[in-house]
Regions:
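Basic, flexible linker segments flanking DNA-binding modules
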Residues: 1-70, 146, 154-156, 168-172, ...
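C-terminal domain-tail junction helix/linker
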Residues: 38, 46-47, 54, 158-162, ...
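Active-site-proximal, Lys/Arg-enriched surface segment
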Residues: 55-91
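Active-site beta-loop-alpha junctions of metal-dependent nucleic acid enzymes
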Residues: 75-78, 84-95, 109-134
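Coil-to-beta-strand transition motifs
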Residues: 89, 101-106
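A short acidic/small-residue loop/turn micro-motif
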Residues: 100-102, 112-116, 145
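Short small-residue beta-strand/loop micro-motif enriched in glycine and branched aliphatics
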Residues: 105-109, 165-167, 191
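RNase H-like polynucleotidyl transferase catalytic core
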Residues: 137-144, 158-177, 193-196
């Protein structure tokens, strides 16, 4: 956790927490290999929105384990298909995320795959989400995945009036804000609690996103929540 996150959880002033960490020898990030990277930032909400996908293993019956007679045993749920073959039911889910470069306002959905049609549907709903905060997506930055290189995705961006940019090949750090948001999301939501099922984990996502956007203070934007930088009051054109 960062000093800002500790201060928020404990209800203490950030300066107080920072002072305590410094006295304990945790004041210099360089000693821990956590130097703050040099970051850029777009000048207004919507000028650039980062989009990415994170693959997560499905959770079924306690994440693939079960208890019987007080003993934990491996559990591999299967079913028989129409041809009489045994199939495993546990697979993957795909968390599609969008984060605004200027405000850090974020949107995410858990979806079944990362195909072009799915990515287009996500983009359409993400655009609707940002418009509720007075933000129009001008440019979109993604990696070079097949969904984002498809003709249908290009046509969708054109129809929505969005300029599509892609990262340099083999340089995922170009989309660094998306990568950092995914790490935060995994720590705070996906791995931040014990879930009995994928459905329970998915159900918890909206609440975590609301906290991230409305309450969680972000050091890169003056220790304010992302919503504080949105266009609800018409500050940007």
């Amino acid at each position: 956790m960062t000093a800002a996150e500790i201060a928020e959880v404990l209800g203490m002033a950030l300066s107080t927490v920072s002072g305590i960490l410094t006295r304990l020898g945790f004041g210099k990030l360089g000693l821990l290999g956590l130097e703050q990277p040099v970051r850029y930032e777009r000048g207004r909400p919507g000028e650039l929105v980062h989009v990415d996908v994170k693959k997560l293993g499905r959770i079924e019956r306690g994440a693939g384990k079960r208890w019987r007679d007080g003993l934990r045993q491996h559990y591999n749920p299967t079913y028989t298909d129409l041809h009489g073959r045994r199939r495993q039911t546990v697979g993957w889910e795909y968390v599609h995320i969008a984060i605004d470069d200027h405000s850090r306002l974020a949107y995410a959905e858990v979806l079944a795959d990362e195909r072009a049609t799915t990515a287009i549907g996500f983009l359409t709903r993400a655009r609707r989400f940002y418009r509720r905060y007075g933000i129009e997506i001008e440019q979109l930055l993604t990696d070079n995945g097949s969904a984002y290189r498809s003709r249908s995705h290009a046509l969708a961006c054109r129809k929505l009036g969005i300029r599509h940019l892609r990262t340099r090949p083999y340089r995922p750090q170009t989309n660094g804000k998306a990568e950092r948001f995914i790490r935060t999301m995994l720590a705070g939501w996906a791995y931040g609690a014990i879930y009995a099922s994928s459905h329970e984990r998915t159900h918890a996502l909206d609440g975590w996103l609301w906290h991230y956007n409305h309450q969680r203070r972000h050091s890169a934007i003056g220790h304010q929540a992302p919503v504080s930088r949105t266009n609800l009051l018409g500050s940007y054109t």
